[in-house]
């Protein structure tokens, strides 16, 4: 569906309304692909069949590359991790903090292997920490981080992710 919508979007013969609908189709297809990827990762972790591809990355660069919408400040450190899955996890956590907290911006504060997301208000806290099962991305994010030997913990209005 995603490929089909991209092909249609390239056509010069579409009116504005049709182009808008084709764009919406493409966005929905991307969301579905991400959802299926999250479900697949979660299932492999639960079945103890996940085989992460580890590579060395800088934590600050990882956060910045994973989520251009969320500012990241601080000083990174080199870690060996499954960069793609962790990047998706961090992006999901930040998105959930914004959506469920009904706020426009959160920020990642990076200190070596420790990543702190703030503010995570009272409405978003239970969802982002995985206590309230309303966001698949947050649940899978926690699974990924913990499967790689890290941790996710909420302290006040700060979500701390240790890689």
Enumerate the predicted regions with their spans.
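A conserved beta-strand-to-alpha-helix junction within the catalytic ATP-binding
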Residues: 53-67, 87
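Short alpha-helical segment of the dimerization/phosphotransfer core of two-component systems
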Residues: 27-32
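Short flexible loop/turn segments at helix-to-beta-strand junctions
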Residues: 17, 47-57, 78-80
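Conserved E/DxxT/N motif and adjacent residues on the DHp alpha2 helix
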Residues: 3, 34-48
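Conserved C-terminal segment of the DHp
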Residues: 2-15
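Glycine-rich/acidic phosphate-handling loop/turn and adjacent ATP-lid/helix
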Residues: 114-139
């Amino acid at each position: 569906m995603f490929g089909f919508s991209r092909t249609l979007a390239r056509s010069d013969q579409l009116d504005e309304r049709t182009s808008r609908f084709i764009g919406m189709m493409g966005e929905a297809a991307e969301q579905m692909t991400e959802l299926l990827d999250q479900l697949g990762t979660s299932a492999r972790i639960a079945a103890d069949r996940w085989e992460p591809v580890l590579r060395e990355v800088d934590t600050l660069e990882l956060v910045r590359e994973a989520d251009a919408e969320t500012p990241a400040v601080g000083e990174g450190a080199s870690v060996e991790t499954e960069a793609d899955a962790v990047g998706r996890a961090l992006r999901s956590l930040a998105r959930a903090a914004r959506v469920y907290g009904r706020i426009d911006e959160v920020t990642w504060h990076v200190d070596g292997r420790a990543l702190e997301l703030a503010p995570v208000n009272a409405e978003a806290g239970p969802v982002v920490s995985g206590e309230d099962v309303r966001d698949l991305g947050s649940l899978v994010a926690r699974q990924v981080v913990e499967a790689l030997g890290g941790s996710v913990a909420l302290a006040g209005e700060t979500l701390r992710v240790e890689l």
